């Protein structure tokens, strides 16, 4: 039997693993490409993104632990709330490779819309199990709304650079 803190720490850290993998695409050429794009004046400074995502990932990870614990682990009852969570997390992790790697701003926007829908469904499913766990997702939902609008504006304002075009060397 693992120590009681192991599942709490493990499930809290899981979302950050994908965040670290996604960071691979948000560096070097991907970062130079993004810096060259037209962005609205209200886009967040780069230095804010790691603390924002670290907080959001930790909150959702801990929320998943609460749901997991309330439902007795990975049980049949946990299939929908934790399955939705896993689905939104996979869609979330897909965004950096789509946006920064493939430079497909329109597809990245579609991905964010899917993430937002599945994250909303996750929140509703978690609320039936644990309202406090669901509340841990509220800041994430707000950030997804902001990120979706930002992605739309960047896509709209850079329409000639949609198809994954690369900067000239």
Swiss-Prot record:
Molecular function GO labels: androgen binding; benzodiazepine receptor activity; transmembrane transporter binding
GO biological process, one term: cellular hypotonic response
Subcellular localization, as worded in the UniProt entry: Mitochondrion membrane; Membrane
Keyword DNA damage: no
Residue ranges that the UniProt entry lists as topological domain Mitochondrial intermembrane: 1-5, 68-79, 127-134
Cytoplasmic side: 27-46, 101-105, 156-169
Stored Pfam families: TspO_MBR
Subunit structure of this chain's protein: Interacts with TSPOAP1. Interacts with MOST-1. May interact with STAR.
This protein's name: Translocator protein
Natural source organism: Mus musculus
Lineage of the species this protein comes from: Eukaryota, Metazoa, Chordata, Craniata, Vertebrata
